[in-house]
Amino acid sequence: MQTAITKKWMKEWWILSLAALISFGKLSCPSVSNAYPIFAQQNYENPREATGRIVCANCHLAKKTVDLEAPQSVLPDTVFEAIVKIPYDTRIKQVLANGKKGGLNVGAVLILPEGFELAPPNRIPTELKNKLGKLSFQTYRPGEKNIIVVGPVPGKLYSEIIFPVLSPDPGTNKEAHFLKYPIYVGGNRGRGQIYPDGSKSNNTVYTASATGKIKRITRKEGKGGYEIIIEESSGGREAIDVVPPGPELIVSEGEFVKADQPLTNNPNVGGFGQGEVEIVLQDPRRIQGLLAFFASVVLAQIFLVLKKKQFEKVQLAEMNF
């Protein structure tokens, strides 16, 4: 009896220990999925605001270019490529969360018209699959197939991101129409400067919180960073500014600083950009009609030339007579 109780107690102890270990692991080792674009997905119902601004710009403050290439027109139920280009100098390094330097990641969001969606694997040609490599795509929201996000992925490998897109067929989808549609894109390279809760990352400028003389600068042990004590000019109080590891100090002890004056350099080397293109969902019957029209024009020209030659022969015969 005692042995059974002891075994049961040990089993429960192991289960509790394992649960505690898993919980601790989740807290101390956050998943990669907690990186962008999950921030936008968690905080914004739609990635594009009513003003046209894509919400990624709220965290990635620096402006950079991004290009989108897509066909001017597509036929219904057709797979085509939408290519997002995120150019940057791959030799540069960014400040990582631990303060060290590392390569830049890139990410993109593609906002397609209603009815357009990511092409299913069985519809993607082999050649296009080879171009995609190991890229993983996801929808911004469950059920919203027209908004696709990708990233973060290594910028050295994916400065160009290819989205395989499937156009809708108005014959089977009553919500789709043969019209001209806009496609919106947002793309970033590097880490953001602000987290969704409004706090700063270590990839931005840190400024003085008060006006006064820098009394002391202390380098923090362990993870790194600095603690800066400013003796305020008015009142003689002390303001403490904490700088995380990453940004480099550009001030020294004894220096007089004003409120909001930079204490560090700006370590950010990345940025965000957005753009748009237009695409026409083309009705095949219009193309057939256009081809028929061109054919009729060509035939008319041929008959006109033949008629002219016939007329010239008649005139020549009359002159000889």
Swiss-Prot record:
Component of the cytochrome b6-f complex, which mediates electron transfer between photosystem II (PSII) and photosystem I (PSI), cyclic electron flow around PSI, and state transitions. The keyword NAD does not apply. GO terms for cellular component: chloroplast thylakoid membrane. Its cofactor is heme. This is Cytochrome f. Gene3D superfamilies: 2.40.50.100, Cytochrome f large domain (2.60.40.830), Single helix bin (1.20.5.700). Belongs to the cytochrome f family. It is a single-pass membrane protein. It is found in: Plastid, Chloroplast thylakoid membrane. Heme binds at residues 36, 56, 59-60. Residues 1-35 form the signal peptide. The 4 large subunits of the cytochrome b6-f complex are cytochrome b6, subunit IV (17 kDa polypeptide, petD), cytochrome f and the Rieske protein, while the 4 small subunits are PetG, PetL, PetM and PetN. The complex functions as a dimer. Keywords: Chloroplast, Electron transport, Heme, Iron, Membrane, Metal-binding, Photosynthesis, Plastid, Signal, Thylakoid, Transmembrane, Transmembrane helix, Transport. The chain crosses the membrane at residues 287-307. GO terms for biological process: photosynthesis. SUPFAM superfamilies: Cytochrome f subunit of the cytochrome b6f complex, transmembrane anchor (SSF103431), Cytochrome f, large domain (SSF49441), Rudiment single hybrid motif (SSF51246). GO terms for molecular function: electron transfer activity; heme binding; iron ion binding. Binds 1 heme group covalently.
